[in-house]
């Protein structure tokens, strides 16, 4: 017996050692996964990905004109490139939102980020597949400063490039153009799972009162991305396009020269790298984060019939029937259910109204903001670079702050659904008032020779106006570009050539007949408008306030939406939201705003015998029409917010009851009971607590999970 003791002791020691080693391995495993078991780490990773997504989208906008000149594209061509992102996104957003809710959401987001990285790299590829950029050096017509001056006696007819060759190159089929379109489609496809799956994943793993703050941070990063994109665009376009292939010290042009083309491809490479590395982090997160027993983890979700919600909710938000296997529904059946579920969602007035209101708010941003830089140039006589810098440093940061504050207010004030919709209505009213003030903040149209006034500073009466006059008939002036100059007589001319200036120092301008010959000079740019500087400063301040206040409605709208659908429909409902945002909020508004702006044009350029871009607008009509469209969209959004509030208020009075007395089945299902207090004793009548609004999206026959619809 004594001999066995050492053996037993030794066996027990070995067993203890094995248990100790196993415990240490378990601790190491926990340590390895602990970094990716924190929802805050996921938030940081998602923010990095959304920041990169917003950056690459804005960067494309900042280099569109560079692409147009580099590959001889028309404005319609670059418009197709810009819209290709939405086409790729629309193609898959519903499918990704539906099937993504049932799969591994972080991995799907990571795959989407890698696809976006591939699209960004393909966007830069055309520069490396085509020939180096060649510019015409020493054109006499433009002079040393790149100014369009009077070419008397046809002195420059043989100096510049062949116009026929330019037109042939412009209309030739360009495979690089198709490659750019394909790259943008890839970017749109890759962006599909990032927003809806990321939002639903975060909402499933945070406390209800913290959800608005987390979502607000997400959308803040998405809006902050465009500011980074514009800044990156301004930096890259100052670098010569072929700087990696040639010695730039031998260049005789600068970024201010009209022949300069910047390194448009550099930003796409940088964005591709950022997208790729931020996507890799997503593959480390599990499908379901470990549960946390924190107070307030209850979700203010829609209450469905039966006691399905007494079971723990999977992290992907999909509840399955306990007797139903995972593979019960075929792929075809799952596809067949999508139209039914979509119709069911849209048949709910609360869901439909809040989605349409969000579409109207986004439509203002997509339409008004898309042409805001152009508006600043036309109204306040700013340069393109100055307008973009102001937008990047003022309006966009204010919008980011507004989205963050909106989520913070919802969290700090613990707003219910009714409180959130009231906040959205108030924010809408204040921002609409700011837009109304824009009607009175602008500059009048400056007098332009041959367009708004006659040559010689006479009022525009009698015969039709014509920019060609006897003073410039022999100058061979062209209308393919707009390089305005301000004459000493206070009149703006389309170019130094139209002013009759035959010297590159802009003197001796024959069309300035109201001033002495020695003073017949012009300076580059439009003539200033009286009081325009003061109006611009006021406009800029109001624009900052408008961006700040208007953006505060975004987070409450998303919060209302995800609180008015059942958990298993959350990801799909967000997919429907983003689909409609693109269909109604991103695609039509730029077309509507653009058509309205074009209707205010006073003078069109011509290129290769065809009508080109508008170079001069009626500022007053432009301002009224441009701002009025935004006001109309904001007003429509307020009507939809009001309708949503009425629906919520009526259902609140109907379903939310005191806990005194018994409750019917319908009253019970729509009461203040949540997942955590089902089956518990009713709250005493004397105990005060915040009543939660629960809107029952599903009818009683829709009480099962998604597969029951089959």
UniProtKB/Swiss-Prot annotation:
Residue ranges of the region described as Disordered: 1-25
Cytoplasmic side: 1-40, 101-106, 204-222, 287-344, 411-414, 563-571, 649-705
Coiled coil regions in record: none
Positions annotated as glycosylated: 153, 169, 381, 457, 502, 505, 519
InterPro entries attached to this UniProt entry: Kazal_dom (IPR002350), Kazal_dom_sf (IPR036058), MFS_trans_sf (IPR036259), OATP (IPR004156)
GO terms under biological process: monoatomic ion transport; positive regulation of canonical NF-kappaB signal transduction; positive regulation of MAPK cascade; prostaglandin transport; sodium-independent organic anion transport
Entry's transmembrane regions: 41-60, 80-100, 107-131, 175-203, 223-243, 262-286, 345-366, 387-410, 415-438, 540-562, 572-597, 631-648
Membrane topology according to the record: Multi-pass membrane protein
Residue ranges, compositional bias (Gly residues): 1-15
Extracellular side: 61-79, 132-174, 244-261, 367-386, 439-539, 598-630
Catalysis performed (reactions): L-thyroxine(out) = L-thyroxine(in); prostaglandin E1(out) = prostaglandin E1(in); prostaglandin E2(out) = prostaglandin E2(in); prostaglandin F2alpha(out) = prostaglandin F2alpha(in)
Function of the molecule: Putative organic anion antiporter with apparent broad substrate specificity. Recognizes various substrates including thyroid hormone L-thyroxine, prostanoids such as prostaglandin E1 and E2, bile acids such as taurocholate, glycolate and glycochenodeoxycholate and peptide hormones such as L-arginine vasopressin, likely operating in a tissue-specific manner. The transport mechanism, its electrogenicity and potential tissue-specific counterions remain to be elucidated.
Record protein name field: Solute carrier organic anion transporter family member 3A1
Species of the source: Rattus norvegicus
